Amino acid sequence: MKESEGIDLSTHTPMMQQYFRLKAEHPEILLFYRMGDFYELFFDDAKRASQLLDISLTKRGASAGEPIPMAGVPHHAVENYLARLVQMGESVAICEQIGDPATSKGPVERKVVRIVTPGTISDEALLQEKQDNLLAAIWQDGRGFGYATLDISSGRFRVSEPADRETMAAELQRTNPAELLYPESFESMELIDNRHGLRRRPMWEFEPDTARQQLNLQFGTRDLTGFGVEQAKLALRAAGCLLQYAKDTQRTSLPHIRGITMERQQDGIIMDAATRRNLELTQNLSGGVENTLAAVLDCTVTAMGSRMLKRWIHMPSRDIDALKQRQQAISALQEITPDLQPYLRQVGDLERILARLALRTARPRDLARMRHAFQQFPDIREQLAPLDTDSVRRLVSLIGQFDELRDLLERAVVEAPPVLVRDGGVIAPGYHTELDEWRALADGASDYLDRLEIREREKLGLDTLKVGFNGVHGYYIQVSRGQSHLVPIHYVRRQTLKNAERYIIPELKEYEDKVLTSKGKALALEKALYDELFDLLLPHLAELQQSAAALAELDVLTNLAERADTLNYVCPTLSDKPGIKIAGGRHPVVEQVLREPFISNPLSLSPQRRMLIITGPNMGGKSTYMRQAALIVLMAHIGCFVPADQAVIGPVDRIFTRVGAADDLASGRSTFMVEMTETANILHNATENSLVLMDEIGRGTSTYDGLSLAWACAESLANRIKAMTLFATHYFELTTLPEKMEGVVNVHLDAREHGDTIAFMHSVQDGAASKSYGLAVAALAGVPKEVIKRARQKLKELETLSNNASSSHIDGAQLALLNTDEPSPAIEALEAIDPDALTPRQALDWLYQLKKML
């Protein structure tokens, strides 16, 4: 608001003075200032809104001799404009007229009633139906981070403490917050620089004592031990800032936020940012949602179920007991899925309706939907009654009865209420006697007017006389211009038209006052009764939220039961013995988009068979085979059935993928640098229980550099880390690894040549591939025949040279470049030296000692 800084308020109208005072309280965000039927913006706000929303920029009055820039949007369309701004990461303060223009002396009283920010929206029109909308806060202390997320549209409050930047980057990608709060002194700006909705906050908002006080006050507790977060010092700093920001923007209490949960890495399968991206879990590599795992698995019938399924996909569980309970529920629900899903569909997005109820922003149709949801509960219970499994019984016990609340809403709210309570007609007839009386008075107007019109027409003999109502002038008696000279003296002219005159008489004026008063009284009483409904519903909020969560889970499990039936999935066996054994495995996404039948393949990994060296032609299916292994393991760890004939899945702590690569131009990193960064992350963090996918490692550099790196990485993964590894490569030299190392096995994807054409069999066979078929693939891609012919000649020359050259022998021992288990003694000694504490003589002695170590 630079243009309005340092202005003399006395030179402005009282209305603009009021604007400046309100804008000073919200200098960083857009202020929507209500003026009649419009929300107006001024100065820099107007210019910015004009650009962002493509609305007209006009002028109003003057400041310092210059016209004041102004832009506006109609009040009835404001939600559409807010939705667009929120998607761009903007925040908006909504300033409403709260005074009565009729009784106000000077400008109507106004105040900011809510602040709409990307991370704190709860309005249905502003939210993506099937995506969580998270507000997040981040804090850093050295290498470690504190991270908190809040979904204000459900009350879900989570914290974690990522140990390093890689883990923090993975958390940011997993949660994908709409708005991120960070402290002024935040060190790792490169982690968050490219995100929308960044909000810089003062350091004092992250004070740990203030955070504890805020959280205890919110939850009504003396300490946070019961939530398991008492010792999470970094996470609590982030949580305190986040909660304060949520309260400041909502301008109301947040009763639906009733607890906080600590998320620990070891609770789920850990996946870094590259793995989530490469496996295309909820977003494909182009940024869309088509052809992702979620797109295949998500046929949920409620939006809250869809959001829960995506959370499960992004955080696969390692709690075997919980996963087996999900499997049991899916097996049981397969019998009743077609009968149960129609009732679940009618429940709707109860989770977000309850959040709006808690924030007291629920609209009449929200209450009607809540009533409709309650009406489904008996049928849902009836459908579930025959199922005798612990997991289903648990869900049934969590779904409340709420017969009294259903009865209340059936009596109180009309069948099809209007959008807004201010439109009237929300409260049902018969619910409140006084309201019925006021409405009868207001609604009786038409009968009275008909009687008055007949009486006056007959009494005066004026056949053109009629009685009507106009929104500007109120009630009137209209007589044609030709008969207007015949009206009696007590007819007072109210309006002149081209062909008629309109009059008012004392009797009609008295009735008009009575009707308008009754309409106003009815609307005021209706608003009071509507607020009273909130007071009657909110004491049950905790049980309602619990029921909504149970119904969302029931929707997810019923959906997974339907998917298992429809897509021919089987229940995997979750074992405590290390290894992965899959018979007839299929890629869940690729098999859905292929026109021809998908070729299933087996996979066997164990401590005795821990690495597969995978060779075969481009387009042969190596990447698909590797990804399908990771996706089957992931699906098993969300409790889902899997695309296979049979599957036994042992303990898996992490999934890593190093597949495909592209230049990271924004960070100035080449394809090869991206590849090596991801590889380094795997070599540092993988364990013997990790599943590692390595696809074409080393191809981004020269042949011998690449081969050397690939060999050394394979050795390190097989010998030192002993991870379960699928290692796809075009370096045929690597197929000699099984001869040199235990637990390494060659497999290949088959292909057949027929003359100049090639047929990919897509089947995995034991042993190494005989050739790469690169030229055949190039021909398939449409490379000109003369180029293919020349390439065949050159290939023969190179193969002859290679066979004759003594340098073609690769010594595996020399190529283990990265397998440096033992650090250099000289480096260790250097790291232990404090140069500032040495005398010149001591420094010289150290030089001699280091020389001996080399």
From Swiss-Prot:
Keywords: ATP-binding, DNA damage, DNA repair, DNA-binding, Nucleotide-binding. GO terms for biological process: mismatch repair. ATP binds at residues 616-623. GO terms for cellular component: cytosol. Pfam families: MutS_I, MutS_II, MutS_III, MutS_IV, MutS_V. One of its GO terms (molecular function) is ATP-dependent DNA damage sensor activity. This protein is involved in the repair of mismatches in DNA. It is possible that it carries out the mismatch recognition step. This protein has a weak ATPase activity. Belongs to the DNA mismatch repair MutS family. This is DNA mismatch repair protein MutS. It comes from Pectobacterium atrosepticum (strain SCRI 1043 / ATCC BAA-672). The gene is mutS.
